[in-house]
């Protein structure tokens, strides 16, 4: 069994088992702390409920935008390799969507590497679709930068589903065009 609880600053000393994955974006400590300070309700961890709890995954998000662009953004989500296929990522995504609805957001969005087919299929299974392709979003100091898909899922406030579009893979933009 697992427990979902708020992400605490002290968790930063216990999550190496989660972050040691080539597809997991890692950040400096001040970045994590700024999220925990500004958006504490959008940062949670999954933890084993054993006598010696172990972090199994986390999600960090934020609320941003104005007007019809007001949304919840998934900044990071990852699950430790030995805890995958247990439904933890789905639970954390559901949690963030629930908070987004409670904050009256129009949609939830996230960025995913265009080459990460497993993650893209996972998000599509949750109801997300590609809104646009961001050219060179992920920098690579040793080679060619990698594109990202901006994926979105409309929330209950977006009754007309204006936050999504068909064939989003064909709508290309630069990272400079991504602002809310």
Swiss-Prot record:
Catalytic activity reads: N-terminal L-methionyl-L-asparaginyl-[protein] + acetyl-CoA = N-terminal N(alpha)-acetyl-L-methionyl-L-asparaginyl-[protein] + CoA + H(+); N-terminal L-methionyl-L-glutaminyl-[protein] + acetyl-CoA = N-terminal N(alpha)-acetyl-L-methionyl-L-glutaminyl-[protein] + CoA + H(+); N-terminal L-methionyl-L-aspartyl-[protein] + acetyl-CoA = N-terminal N(alpha)-acetyl-L-methionyl-L-aspartyl-[protein] + CoA + H(+); N-terminal L-methionyl-L-glutamyl-[protein] + acetyl-CoA = N-terminal N(alpha)-acetyl-L-methionyl-L-glutamyl-[protein] + CoA + H(+)
CDD domains for the chain: NAT_SF (cd04301)
Q: Does the keyword Nucleus apply?
A: yes
Q: Name the source's superkingdom.
A: Eukaryota
Q: Which organism is it from?
A: Schizosaccharomyces pombe (strain 972 / ATCC 24843)
Q: Which PANTHER family match?
A: N-ALPHA-ACETYLTRANSFERASE 20 (PTHR45910:SF1)
UniProt xrefs under InterPro entries: Acyl_CoA_acyltransferase (IPR016181), GNAT_dom (IPR000182), NatB_acetyltransferase_subunit (IPR051646)
Top EC class for this record: transferase
Which Gene3D superfamilies does the annotation name? 3.40.630.30
**Protein name, UniProt field:** N-terminal acetyltransferase B complex catalytic subunit naa20
Q: Which Pfam families would you find in this protein's record?
A: Acetyltransf_1
